[in-house]
């Protein structure tokens, strides 16, 4: 194939070429993953960036996203309003102590009120005064220009708003907002010099063409960070009984995203434990970033298992991206 060599030499793969490669059963997934690894190693070496999520507001949402346990369709769910500043600040210390590079503050809902943006902004200022090198990613939903400016001024480094699926498949996933609402939010953040983070959820019944379209959409959007989530079916949601993924399919998806977005931070995110299972380590041959700890309403695996996974691969935590560089051997033992 020599795909990686061709990409490093400047070749721009077309959607048609990538779809043909992705669907070719004669191309072994591990061979495709090896091509992705050449690119991953070229741009990121063997380093792995660590991220941590805090669910700062839960279950209060008017949207009908078919994958989400916090949507309006779910009656039995964990609900609480925006938590106090002190709890968010405490979470930042946990992130710092665990060698996390990016601390992600997430709120449920269509978008934040001005009061909520002020609350988050004040909190971020305090966090930055205590942990100036800890990167802050906000995920608050649809925002306006004034809110984006407040977040930037407070010290928010990155803003996450996932496209989740392809434009063509979007209305099968959610109808209470549009695909354009999501892409406009990312463009607004870029206009305010906030690093754009946008990714996908795979396994919701999308086609192979949709998967390719998602990867190219994020390339065209120029997202700095791309989280790849794998559907973790939640009872009561539209996709609660969906079973469309295998570990090898997940690996093939991650490899494809690396081939199309060779220089970007690609993160294996929600659902990796239940969908990749014993093949989780192989995903880091293409991805260079993971979430550590729990997700929004589903649990992750113990932190030490992630540290061991990184170490067992012969990889290392990317300490260049985290503030806490002390006691490295506590989390990643020398090979």
Curated annotation (Swiss-Prot):
Q: How does it assemble?
A: Homodimer.
Q: Where is the Radical SAM core domain?
A: 43-269
User: Where is [4Fe-4S] cluster bound in this sequence?
Assistant: 61, 65, 68
- Keyword Transferase among UniProt keywords: yes
Q: What is the species listed in this Swiss-Prot or TrEMBL entry?
A: Staphylococcus aureus (strain MRSA252)
Q: Which CDD domains does the entry link to?
A: Radical_SAM
What name does UniProt use for this protein? Answer: Biotin synthase
Q: Which UniProt keywords apply?
A: 2Fe-2S, 4Fe-4S, Biotin biosynthesis, Iron, Iron-sulfur, Metal-binding, S-adenosyl-L-methionine, Transferase
Per the annotation, how and in what number is the cofactor bound? Binds 1 [4Fe-4S] cluster. The cluster is coordinated with 3 cysteines and an exchangeable S-adenosyl-L-methionine.
UniProt-annotated binding residues for [2Fe-2S] cluster: 104, 137, 197, 267
Looking at the keywords, is Translocase present?
no
GO annotation terms (biological process): biotin biosynthetic process
Enumerate the cofactors the protein uses. Answer: [4Fe-4S] cluster; [2Fe-2S] cluster
What is the name of the gene encoding this protein?
Answer: bioB
Task: Tell me the HAMAP family matching this sequence.
Answer: BioB
UniProt GO MF annotations: 2 iron, 2 sulfur cluster binding; 4 iron, 4 sulfur cluster binding; biotin synthase activity; iron ion binding
Instruction: Describe the task this protein carries out.
Output: Catalyzes the conversion of dethiobiotin (DTB) to biotin by the insertion of a sulfur atom into dethiobiotin via a radical-based mechanism.
Q: Write down the SUPFAM superfamilies for this protein, in alphabetical order.
A: Radical SAM enzymes
Which family does the record claim for this protein?
Belongs to the radical SAM superfamily. Biotin synthase family.
């Amino acid at each position: 194939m020599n795909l990686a060599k061709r990409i490093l030499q400047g070749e721009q793969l077309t959607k048609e070429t990538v779809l043909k490669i992705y669907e070719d059963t004669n191309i072994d997934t591990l061979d495709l993953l090896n091509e992705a690894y050449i690119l991953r190693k070229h741009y990121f070496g063997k380093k792995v960036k660590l991220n941590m999520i805090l669910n700062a507001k839960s279950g209060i949402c008017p949207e009908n996203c078919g994958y989400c346990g916090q949507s309006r369709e779910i009656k039995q769910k964990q609900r609480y309003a925006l938590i106090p500043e002190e709890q968010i600040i405490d979470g930042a210390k946990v992130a710092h102590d665990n060698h996390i590079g990016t601390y992600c503050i997430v709120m449920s809902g269509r978008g934040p009120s001005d009061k909520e943006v002020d609350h988050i902004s004040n909190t971020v200022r305090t966090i930055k005064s205590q942990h100036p090198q800890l990167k802050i990613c906000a995920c608050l939903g649809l925002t306006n220009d004034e809110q984006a400016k407040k977040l930037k001024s407070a010290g928010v480094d990155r803003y996450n708003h996932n496209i989740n699926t392809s434009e063509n498949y979007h209305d099968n996933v959610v109808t209470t907002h549009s695909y354009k609402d999501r892409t406009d939010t990312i463009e607004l953040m870029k206009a305010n010099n906030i690093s754009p983070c946008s990714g996908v959820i795979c396994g919701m019944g999308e086609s192979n063409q949709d998967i390719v379209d998602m990867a190219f959409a994020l390339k065209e959007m120029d997202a700095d960070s791309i989280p790849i989530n794998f559907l973790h079916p939640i009872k009561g949601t539209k996709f609660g009984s969906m079973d469309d993924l295998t570990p090898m399919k997940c690996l093939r998806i991650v490899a494809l995203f690396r081939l199309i977005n060779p220089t970007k931070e690609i993160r294996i995110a929600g659902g990796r434990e239940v969908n990749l299972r014993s093949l989780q380590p192989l995903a880091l041959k293409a991805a260079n970033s993971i979430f550590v700890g729990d997700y929004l309403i589903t649990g992750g695996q113990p932190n030490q298992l992630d540290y061991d996974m990184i170490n067992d691969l012969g990889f290392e935590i990317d300490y260049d991206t985290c503030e806490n560089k002390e006691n490295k051997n506590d989390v990643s033992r020398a090979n």
